[in-house]
Amino acid sequence: GHSDTEVLLHAFAEWGAGCVAMCNGIFAFAVWQVQAGTLFLARDRCGVKPLFSAHAEQNLIFGSEIQALLAHPAVPPPVEANGRDKVLFLGPGRTPGCGVFQNVRELLPGQYALYEADTGRLTLHTYWRLEDHDHPDDFAATVRRVRDLVTDAIERQLVSDVPVATFLSGGLDSSLI
């Protein structure tokens, strides 16, 4: 079988940074490009999977949790001047992009970054942004459209090379299914 990671690596080899626009799902990943000396970092459109980074001693330290960065001896733990307020809101309420600690930053939802090892430059790119559109449909058409979108999302999640199971909690999303 082909794991998601293997498919993602092949997609990156084929399309480069353009592969993230084709991804459907939640992800945060990095690809080291040996010949170019660059590190590619990407985060899913809604930011479900976090991705933090810090410049330290001419290197870029990155991980899915701030604790991973702080475990590195080159990443100091001092909190930013306004970070104390944010420590109380480490959930969805905190400021997007802020890593709370000095020199720790979070890649925003729908962004990818390219780190050049020889210059230490980190360039951020937005590949997706939620857009606002007029909604001219009536109630019945809206119900049909939402039903189609939910069915499509469920069918996409059922594609797997391993057995699939589900946990229905009784919340809004579970009740919808």
Predicted features, each with a name:
Residues G1-I177:
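Cysteine-centered catalytic environments shared across enzyme families
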